[in-house]
C-alpha cells in the first residue's frame, strides 16, 4: 500500500469517528479535520506578577533632581544643655532708685546724740579735761606703736601736752609712767609730735634727754610730770587725747 493510499484511509476513519460522536453530544467542539494550519489568535491576557526580585545595582545614568521636602516629622527629645556663652557687653546705667531716707537719717542723728552723751559721761568720769581736750588713760602697758593703734581705733591720738596745764592733766590721769606722742625718730635730738610738727613746750627731767644706748627715741611722762627719753619698744601706759 502506498503512502498516499494510507493517508486517505486515515482521513475516512477520522470522519466516521467524528460523526459517531456528534450523534450523542449537542454543542460539542468542531470535528477535527485534516486541513492546513489556521491563523494565529489574538495575544492572551497578561499573567499574574511574579515574585519580587532582588534589588538591582545602581544605574549608570545621571542622578535625578532632588524631590520636594517631605512632611515635618514629630518633635524629638530635648537635647543636652549647651556650653555657657560669653559674657555680654555691659548694659546702660539704670535710673537711680528713689528712696526716702529721712526716717533713717533721723534715727542716725538720734543714735549719734546718744553716743555723744555716753562718750561725754565716760570722759567726765574717767578723764581729765583741759579746754576742749580730754585725756584718758589705759590700764594696760604697751609699746608706742600699740598705743598709737589703740588711740586711733577710738578716733583719738597719743596724748601730747602743748602747755603746763595739759601736762598736769596728763600727769593726774596717768598716775604712773606713760607714753607721750613725742619722738626724735627722724632727726636725733629734734623732738616732734606724731604729725611731724616740732614741739615747743617741753618739761624734761634733769639730765634728759640723754639717748642712753643710742636707742631712746620716744618720750614718757613720769609720776612727777617730768619727761624722759626711752626706747619705743618698752611698755608703758597709754594716754589718749580726744577733742570735744
Curated annotation (Swiss-Prot):
Keywords: Calcium, Coiled coil, Collagen, Complement activation lectin pathway, Complement pathway, Disulfide bond, Glycoprotein, Hydroxylation, Immunity, Innate immunity, Lectin, Mannose-binding, Repeat, Secreted, Signal. InterPro entries: C-type_lectin-like, C-type_lectin-like/link_sf, C-type_lectin_CS, Ca-dependent_lectin, Collagen, CTDL_fold. Residues 45-57, 90-99 have a biased composition (Basic and acidic residues). PROSITE patterns: C_TYPE_LECTIN_1, C_TYPE_LECTIN_2. GO terms for biological process: antiviral innate immune response; cell surface pattern recognition receptor signaling pathway; complement activation, classical pathway; complement activation, lectin pathway; defense response to Gram-positive bacterium; killing by host of symbiont cells; negative regulation of viral process; positive regulation of complement activation. Hydroxylation on proline residues within the sequence motif, GXPG, is most likely to be 4-hydroxy as this fits the requirement for 4-hydroxylation in vertebrates. Residues 40-101 are annotated as: Disordered. GO terms for molecular function: calcium ion binding; calcium-dependent protein binding; D-mannose binding; galactose binding; identical protein binding; phosphatidylinositol-4-phosphate binding; protease binding; signaling receptor binding. The modification 4-hydroxyproline is found at residues 43, 58, 69, 78, 81. Disulfide bonds join 151-240, 218-232. Residues 129-241 form the C-type lectin domain. The coiled-coil domain mediates trimerization. Calcium-dependent lectin involved in innate immune defense. Binds mannose, fucose and N-acetylglucosamine on different microorganisms and activates the lectin complement pathway. Binds to late apoptotic cells, as well as to apoptotic blebs and to necrotic cells, but not to early apoptotic cells, facilitating their uptake by macrophages. Oligomeric complex of 3 or more homotrimers. Interacts with MASP1 and MASP2. Interacts with MEP1A and MEP1B and may inhibit their catalytic activity. This is Mannose-binding protein C.
